[in-house]
Amino acid sequence: MSYPGKDKNIPGRIIEALEDLPLSYLVPKDGLAALVNAPMRVSLPFDKTIFTSADDGRDVNINVLGTANSTTSSIKNEAEKERLVFKRPSNFTSSANSVDYVPTNFLEGLSPLAQSVLSTHKGLNDSINIEKKSEIVSRPEAKHKLESVTSNAGNLSFNDNSSNKKTKTSTGVTMTQANLAEQYLNDLKNILDIVGFDQNSAEIGNIEYWLQLPNKKFVLTTNCLTKLQMTIKNITDNPQLSNSIEITWLLRLLDVMVCNIKFSKSSLKMGLDDSMLRYIALLSTIVLFNIFLLGKNDSNLHRESYIMEPVNFLSDLIESLKILTIEYGSLKIEFDTFQEALELLPKYIRNGPFLDDNVTAKLVYIFSDLLMNNDIEATTNIQFQSFWDNVKRISSDILVSLFGSFDQQRGFIIEELLSHIEKLPTKRIQKKLRKVGNQNIYITDFTFTLMSMLENINCYSFCNQMKDIAPENIDLLKNEYKKQEEFLFNIVEHINDTILERFFKNPSALRYVIDNFVQDLLLLISSPQWPVTEKILSSLLKRLLSVYSPSMQVSANIETICLQLIGNIGSTIFDIKCSTRDHEDNNLIKMINYPETLPHFFKSFEECIAYNETIKCRRSATRFLWNLRLGTILILEEYTKDAKEQIITVDNELKKILEQIKDGGLGPELENREADFSTIKLDYFSILHAFELLNLYDPYLKLILSLLAKDKIKLRSTAIKCLSMLASKDKVILSNPMVKETIHRRLNDSSASVKDAILDLVSINSSYFEFYQQINNNYNDDSIMVRKHVLRINEKMYDETNDIVTKVYVIARILMKIEDEEDNIIDMARLILLNRWILKVHEVLDQPEKLKEISSSVLLVMSRVAIMNEKCSQLFDLFLNFYLLNKEAHSKEAYDKITHVLTILTDFLVQKIVELNSDDTNEKNSIVDKQNFLNLLAKFADSTVSFLTKDHITALYPYMVSDEKSDFHYYILQVFRCTFEKLANFKQKFLYDLETTLLSRLPKMNVREIDEAMPLIWSVATHRHDTARVAKACSSCLSHLHPYINKANNEEAAIVVDGKLQRLIYLSTGFARFCFPKPSNDKIAFLQEGETLYEHITKCLLVLSKDKITHVIRRVAVKNLTKLCGNHPKLFNSRHVLHLLDKEFQSDQLDIKLVILESLYDLFLLEERKSVRNTGVNSTLSSNSILKKKLLKTNRVEFANDGVCSALATRFLDNILQLCLLRDLKNSLVAIRLLKLILKFGYTNPSHSIPTVIALFASTSQYIRHVAYELLEDLFEKYETLVFSSLSRGVTKAIHYSIHTDEKYYYKHDHFLSLLEKLCGTGKKNGPKFFKVLKRIMQSYLDDITDLTSTNSSVQKSIFVLCTNISNITFVSQYDLVSLLKTIDLTTDRLKEVIMDEIGDNVSSLSVSEEKLSGIILIQLSLQDLGTYLLHLYGLRDDVLLLDIVEESELKNKQLPAKKPDISKFSAQLENIEQYSSNGKLLTYFRKHVKDT
């Protein structure tokens, strides 16, 4: 672009001129000020003929008029071709003389356009001959205030400043506020001159003010509307002008604005998508609302059309925004104007306009929809997103303004807003939420608006209008408060009910609605800036809690979701309670009881209100918080009216806050203006304790705990998760007695998912230490998931605790899992033990102190686990020998690490034993540790790899020769025995001394020590290659024994109880068991040529086992004979031995039978152990599949005694089974233990044993029932068909066993059928089979009852036991129950007829005695009561017994309802019947019973 002076040394722009010269050189000061501030531009004057007629034939192109660059077209217009007269610069001549260069050609350097214009209009005149004509056109985006106004130029001033001060104008003339006001009024009149004071006076030909549309309608131009907008605004800011403005002017303007909007809308609908038309309509809307804001109360100004037209236009524009495809940048001015128009609407509403219900409804409909609209997707354009957020903000403000201004419409507004809740965002994306406060909290617009509305329900305005604090006014205030509270309560209840009802109707689709609402409330509950949250949330929580009341019937899905919501709310409440400062958790009752807490409570309220005031929080929120304070005071006043001291404090507080209102405030300023929100939040938490929400914590907790006992698994799992949320905040919650007891119960729950959730719960913050025993009740659970979880928890507990008792307990449970049906669990358990016992030691080999510490800890744990019980001892041996010391299970490097660490541990172990023995202490713990260490050392010595060295043996030898009488000597003997079996090349002197010591101490040893010492003596003699001394000792023993043998042969009764004889029997048997297995070369007294020692001792023992030998000696002899046979199994082939054993089992000598069983047990165990050692790892469960395949290819090593063990088990099985069912439980355990071993090793056909195992289910001993359950469970996995075929015999045996073990309360043994059902009667496959067998058993018993002669006491007792057990079974199918009930019902009717036939109509005519009738009557009553009991238990009606066969078969797929939990046991009814029988009133009771039924 060219300009005058281009390419010359003259500044072309002001900024360039300022570099060298002051600004005033180019532009006068006053002119510059006007230039900078004036929101106008000067256009070229038009000839008056332009305005003469609107019908001059010109077609106005609105698109051309809307553009800025229209210069060329204006020049070419004929109406503008009249010569333009240009003003000559007034100082041209003088300035020409003062410069060096004066251009001779003024056209030089001008653009072609400028030159063409000047050439057309030639000639210059002096300025005095030129009349100034200018026209002001306001820019649409004017942002500056006009400070200069000249009256002769007709300029308009738009100064916003309303202060009464002088304003400097560009003319240098000062103007007062009154002058400005007058100027504003003149501006309005000037505009009205052209717009017209009525329709006829409008200068529609003025194209600067009027724009003709294609439909021949006229609308005001954007320039005119901008001027008008600024003028109205200036007038609005000057209230003194209100009376000077005539209503007719405003009505005219309103009419024009409405027409502008109408005509623009109609043109847009015709297809003219012109942004200028929308802009005109928006500006008209702004002007219209600004007119409303003038404060004129004339009803004519508030016609429905005036408000509805702009509102409808805005509504249409909103709809078009939803489908807008144009870029935001091209519509920025329109969007800004639209936003400005909307912002005026809430101001208008708050001014108290004359709005009828139709208008209000329209506004509510439009802006509720706009607020909740999510059709417009989130855009990447930040400006557009900001615009849309502002629109929603204003929409919310409009709705809140309507709610606050129109009390009668509040319900409708809330209802309309609730109708849009389905439009809430399905995902909580930040762009779809609104940020509130400075805490980076985002909530939905719905919640924000709803809460902003409800905050307006308070008594602040009422209090503000009170003239004084008189008693009568206080009473009025109380009534007003109750009224407001009631309204708030009802509306909150309605909101929550509506949201929940929508959710209940379609929980899957509308879950996001309730989730969003609750999430918003939880985010705001801790802030004093949102006090109404407490009211909404407490109401919602109560409503959610009521879902679980008996009167509510909802789906399981709804229950689960509601529980999740309750859990989130409860967790937040618990968080608040935990965060509250000490001694500030005071509810109203507590504050009444402790009035000293009141001042601090009121102070907390003051702080929160002052904080809200300081941060400029919403006035409605602060007022609602103040209202809460007022309500609390009124409630306290009601509660404390009888306490003088307290009532004074409360009354003073009430007067104080009311006086503050009269003084124009809500309370004193914040003492510490820099107070942190975290401090204020704690004050607010203290306040919350006085309200309902936090007091709902206890009902919430009780609900959670009660739901843990529900049958619905998902509900229980969710309840546990709720509890977990609390525990994650503070694990102290788990120490709550109520919670603790519930966890204990639920850890025994049958549901795997619930157990898993409980285990997660108790794992929070290592809380499992309080429940470790209950946790490990599930270490052998049916669920793999639960077993793994328990294993992981045990691992953590072992690592985290320093308590040796806990360590031993949990590591023992880990050890038990090296036997499991799941390979992964076996692997886990093995690795845990390997890491803790081996690799952890290996890691610190280069740190002596650490090594000693860790080794000591490992050894202490190992030693205690190894002796914990028989099972742990066996598993420890298995783990040591068949995993750790199994080369096939490890790489060479890993195996070397293991053996190296075990060698080191052995060193420390021997050292520890030596240290403990050297201490002269009698402390119990020290003695126990020493015994445990020796036992562990014995296990190390007995392992497949030798870790003990000669040095170790040498170090332990002094304890061998000591005279100390304790168990230590036994373990030392065991260690030496095992070591000598592996080591060789001992010094002869050491061997000789050791042999001397052993032989000399032999007579003083007890039975256990003899069993260890004899093999050691023989081993030492073998190492010495000299058995002469042993032979001599044996001869000595026999020489003392034979006199007794001779006496027994001659006179059996002459043998009496003799301690010496008993010892000789044990010693001689010991020599025979472990020494001289073959005929000896050394001379042994009394042995014949070729006779072995064990054969000779066998003969001696058979002599001492004769019938007339005293019982004690016979028992010792039989015991030792059986042991001897165990070491030399060929002896069991002796007919003399077998005859003796058979005879003993047929006798009544229980103790001898048990002795034989114990010996057989030792034999079987020893032989199986040998087998395991020979076969190796395949005797344990291996998780290594490659190893399994390898081992399966290896045939099991046969051993000589295999057939003997099986033959013995088979021969004596019946005797063993009989002894299992002894009434004396302690003695029966011996037989049960042997039976378990026989079944485990597979020595006999299990079908013979299964009925007895089933019978043991009826034992009164929980331990025996547990053992029986484990046995049958194992059998069921292997031989399912055998178990089912044995059920009938097993149940019959169980019934007899129940009667046999408890003659008085036999019928209370009511658990064996339910245990059987749990094991083999569940599932689609086994359930029907089990119930079929059960029905057959019942039928067989009932069929045997035909008449009086078939009903003896045994039959009656059997029926009783069967009935009580059936009552505890859990029937699943209706068919199973109904078919059984029909069988029972038919029998009861049949028996009733038999009885009635016998007794006749009167008692005196009895054909038989009542005693003979008692059995059949008891059976009939028990069966009838059982049928009634089962019907009631499952909630069935009597008519199910009338179903025919077809109808009955249809019940197979119908499940029964759950059992009623509050029904007493059936055995109590049988006890009642038996009492009538014992009192001789049975017949009378039967008659009454028959009559009643």
From Swiss-Prot:
The modification Phosphothreonine is found at residues 67, 231, 236, 360. Phosphorylated at alternative sites Ser-43, Ser-74, Ser-162, Thr-360, Ser-1179 and Ser-1183 when the principal phosphorylation sites Thr-67, Ser-127, Ser-157, Ser-163, Thr-231, Thr-236, Ser-305 and Ser-320 are mutated to alanines. Transmembrane segments: none annotated. The keyword Ribonucleoprotein does not apply. One of its GO terms (biological process) is establishment of protein localization to chromatin. InterPro entries: ARM-type_fold, Cohesin_HEAT, Nipped-B_C, Scc2/Nipped-B. Residues 151-170 are annotated as: Disordered. The modification Phosphoserine is found at residues 43, 74, 127, 157, 162-163, 305, 320, 753, 1179, 1182-1183, 1185. The keyword Repeat applies. It is found in: Nucleus; Chromosome, Centromere. GO terms for cellular component: 2-micrometer circle DNA; chromatin; chromosome, centromeric region; cytosol; nucleus; Scc2-Scc4 cohesin loading complex; SMC loading complex. It holds the Pfam family Nipped-B_C. Changing residue 157 to E: In scc2-8E; mimics constitutive phosphorylation, retains normal SCC2-SCC4 interactions and chromatin association, but exhibits decreased viability, sensitivity to genotoxic agents methyl methanesulfonate (MMS) and hydroxyurea (HU), and decreased stability of the MCD1 cohesin subunit in mitotic cells. Keywords: Cell cycle, Centromere, Chromosome, Nucleus, Phosphoprotein, Repeat, Transcription, Transcription regulation. One of its GO terms (molecular function) is cohesin loader activity. HEAT repeats lie at residues 695-732, 734-771, 806-843, 1132-1169, 1244-1281. Changing residue 163 to E: In scc2-8E; mimics constitutive phosphorylation, retains normal SCC2-SCC4 interactions and chromatin association, but exhibits decreased viability, sensitivity to genotoxic agents methyl methanesulfonate (MMS) and hydroxyurea (HU), and decreased stability of the MCD1 cohesin subunit in mitotic cells. Its main location: nucleus. Plays a structural role in chromatin and is involved in sister chromatid cohesion. Forms a complex with SCC4 required for the stable association of the cohesin complex with chromatin, which may act by hydrolyzing ATP from SMC1 and SMC3 heads. Binds to the nucleosome-free promoter regions of ribosomal protein genes and tRNA genes. Involved in transcriptional regulation by cooperating with the RSC complex to maintain nucleosome exhaustion at its binding sites. The N-terminus (residues 1-181) is sufficient for the interaction with SCC4. Present with 3310 molecules/cell in log phase SD medium. Interacts with SCC4. Interacts with the cohesin complex, which is composed of: the SMC1 and SMC3 heterodimer attached via their hinge domain, MCD1/SCC1 which link them, and IRR1/SCC3, which interacts with MCD1. Belongs to the SCC2/Nipped-B family. This is Sister chromatid cohesion protein 2. It comes from Saccharomyces cerevisiae (strain ATCC 204508 / S288c). The gene is SCC2.
